[in-house]
Amino acid sequence: MFNFQDIYHIGIRVPNLSRAMEEMGSSLSLTWAEPIQTEAQSIWTPEEGQRYLPLKFVYSCEGPQHIELLEGPPDSIWDGRQDSGVHHVGVWVDDVANQTEQFLKNGWTLLASSVSPEQGYGGYTYIAPNSGMIVELVSQSILPRFERWWAGGSLAK
């Protein structure tokens, strides 16, 4: 499937990004990349289809396993108001579509993706087995952008 050692982040849903950065940053001795706020994050879910949602997120600069904090809109996969805390682990993969299909063949469920399965899933998917652990498969093609961001640069293309 993939190398589980390629986990590069733990995704945590939070109700308030700034507050969580303060609390966790000082307590865990973390520094943060520049927080990102987008008004139109692409997400497809089986229940809602394609949508574009507001999202705030940030990563710790320290690695190789980073902390990702996410503040999403109500009733979204990123909503930390009702159910904050550890949400998923993120893993770099060479081919999001292929890896996702392999997991689905093994009984995992597709929770969300950047675009629909018919469009090839896009750059990320959230998948889970019946046991409930959520894994985010992320295209390794964006790793250079993330490395630049963690080093103090921009995440933009």
Each language-model region and where it sits:
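A cross-kingdom feature marking solvent-exposed beta-strand/loop segments within repeated
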Residues: T38-P46, P74-W78, V86
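Vicinal oxygen chelate
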Residues: I7-P15, Y59-Q65, P74, G80-V96
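Core segments of cupin and vicinal oxygen chelate
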Residues: F2, R13-E62, N98-Y121, W149-A156
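Hydrophobic secondary-structure block in the mid-to-C-terminal portion of proteins
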Residues: I127-K157
